[in-house]
């Protein structure tokens, strides 16, 4: 397990208490799990994602991630409609471990309310939470 100061936590990403991240990507918002989350889970072997066109409210479960240690639910950091899923994760779920913010992103959404993104934690706030 990584020490808190070894975590890869980009500045341009917003974080949730449940360790998901969200980032503006053109007109869409890209969502995945943080480096902390993938590190805690260990080797990821399967990711279950929703279908394009599915809509979710903030805080609603949108999928699961399965590792050699556990199965964890994925929660929406903000409400919206799924516009894309990362199909590469079906064959290469380990991308979430090796590259949680780029190759390991999970879904993209058309956000219901853009203000929900800014309401999420900054890197500094997320680090503060992790340090307890």
Kindly give the residue locations of the regions a language model identified.
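Charged, amphipathic alpha-helical coiled-coil/dimerization segments
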Residues: 79, 83-84, 90-97
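Charged, well-structured alpha/beta interaction segments
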Residues: 57-73
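ATP/adenylate-binding site constellation spanning eukaryotic-like Ser/Thr protein kinases
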Residues: 76-79, 123
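Short glycine-rich, polar/acidic loop-and-turn segments at beta strand-coil junctions
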Residues: 35-37, 69, 78
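Residue-level recognition of beta-strand microenvironments
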Residues: 22-24, 68, 85-88
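Acidic, low-complexity mobile loops and tails
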Residues: 1-61, 94, 98-117, 123-132
């Amino acid at each position: 397990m990584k020490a808190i100061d070894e975590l890869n936590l980009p500045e341009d990403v917003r974080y949730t208490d449940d360790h998901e991240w969200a980032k503006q990507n053109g007109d869409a918002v890209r969502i995945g799990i943080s480096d902390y989350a993938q590190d805690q889970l260990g080797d990821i072997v399967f990711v279950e994602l929703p279908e394009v066109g599915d809509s979710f409210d903030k805080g609603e479960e949108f999928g699961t991630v399965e590792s050699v240690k556990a199965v964890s639910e994925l929660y929406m950091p903000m409400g919206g409609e799924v516009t894309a899923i990362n199909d590469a994760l079906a064959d290469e779920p380990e991308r979430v471990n090796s590259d949680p913010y780029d190759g390991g992103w999970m879904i993209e959404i058309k956000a219901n309310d853009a203000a929900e993104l800014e309401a999420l934690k900054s890197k500094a706030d997320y680090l503060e939470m992790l340090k307890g």
